[in-house]
Amino acid sequence: MKNKEKYLTNFSEAKRKEATQKYNIIKPFILGKQSLSSISKSKGIALSTLYRWNKLYKEQGLTGLIHNTRVDKGEHKLKQNIIDEIKRLALKNKRNSIATIHRKIANYCIENNFYKPSYKQVYSIIKAMPKSVIDFSHQGEKYYQNKYDLIQIRESSRPNEIWQADHTLLDIYILDQKGNINRPWLTIIMDDYSRAIAGYFISFDAPNAQNTALTLHQAIWNKNNTNWPVCGIPEKFYTDHGSDFTSHHMEQVAIDLKINLMFSKVGVPRGRGKIERFFQTVNQTFLEQLPGYINNNDTSSDLIDFQNFEEKLRYFLIEDYNQKEHSAIQSTPINRWNSNHFFPNMPSSLEQLDLLLLEIPKSRKIHSDGIHFQGFRYSNTNLTAYVGEYVLIRYNPNDMAEIRVFYRDEFLCTAISPDLADYSIDIKEIQHARSQRRKHLKQNIASPSTTDLIKEEKSYGYSPQETTKNVKKLKRYRND
């Protein structure tokens, strides 16, 4: 039987976290900051093991470190509260030697009737702690900032060398899917070299890890619009607000694709002038022309709804901003990104990005007619053999025509909704159609189904993109 290629989604969260820990150990060597021999001495890990980890990571990405998970035999596994106590003692006082900590933890275990760890176990736990964390605890925040904080982002010299993500609360009031007046958030990923927009996400929710991950998924993969060629794997990816706004899944995908994931601290500028100027451009050349713009005195105009606003924003980003000459680079962002016939580094397959998609926490049952999700039916011939089984679903809220189906951590198939297969439908349009249907029912008017309402709007609804060359969406095939 042919071996299936393994992706991050094939492994449990625990396995991926363990592999991430291995990567973080060899990361200073990969970035050219520390030799493997010095890492071996500081971490107490055999040099041959570090060489093997580095080789596996270079060849296979993060999955290589998962494949070669080693299990230590003959050692007692320490309880988490013992490990936490060891770390607490290590951070509490910089004068505490490892021998002192070992004696204190032995007394702690005797008092609580726990198994006492060996000196070697205590040593390994302390040496595995990030030096930056220890320095922050022992030396203070100012010392930490001077030593570890990034001062500025250097100027990039080629496309996809540096991507930046940032978020802003737009200065406009629009109608959300429920008809309420609201202000939307915009998440942007910009290529630093060309100023081209690689991905975007608009939502009424405040910035979060989920939205950043979905934007990165869109930015990396090929777009259906030929006027928007920006794609590929960036060498460095700066995301705002720190690790609280970056999911473990996004970190794992970044490691697997060899993206150097870096964070900007809240309230501390880190070379973010380009993307901040872009947000000013959005305000001055796009938003101020629309009803509901905060700085306009006229508040009597009818507000536009979310769907209409999103279509206008998409047109502005792709057909206007990306295609207009930028004064700082003396070129359009798209031409600059495409200069010298640039060929982006792409994932080997879409499966490598699956962890960036939304995950349904509750498993779904496969029925004889497929999988039922969000009021639609999704089918694929591969599901026939799994009727009655429960599967995990991942999906992109910007394209609800298909879902990714996983069975026991293995990718099973892409299931297609026959009702939506010929359209590019996002979850906001589904919510809008449901809202319209509820209004019809409240008025005792015979209402078409949600599906029919979506199709009607897609067939006859105005879209700003109609004024440009239409690009046909890739045909979806129901049989994988």
UniProtKB/Swiss-Prot annotation:
InterPro entries: Homeodomain-like_sf (IPR009057), Integrase_cat-core (IPR001584), RNaseH-like_sf (IPR012337), RNaseH_sf (IPR036397), Transposase-like_Mu_C (IPR015378), Transposase_Mu_C (IPR009004). Keywords: DNA recombination, DNA-binding, Transposable element, Transposition. Residues 470-480 have a biased composition (Basic residues). It holds the Pfam family rve. Residues 155-341 form the Integrase catalytic domain. One of its GO terms (molecular function) is DNA binding. It comes from the Bacteria. Residues 438-480 are annotated as: Disordered. Residues 36-55 bind DNA. This is Transposase for transposon Tn552.
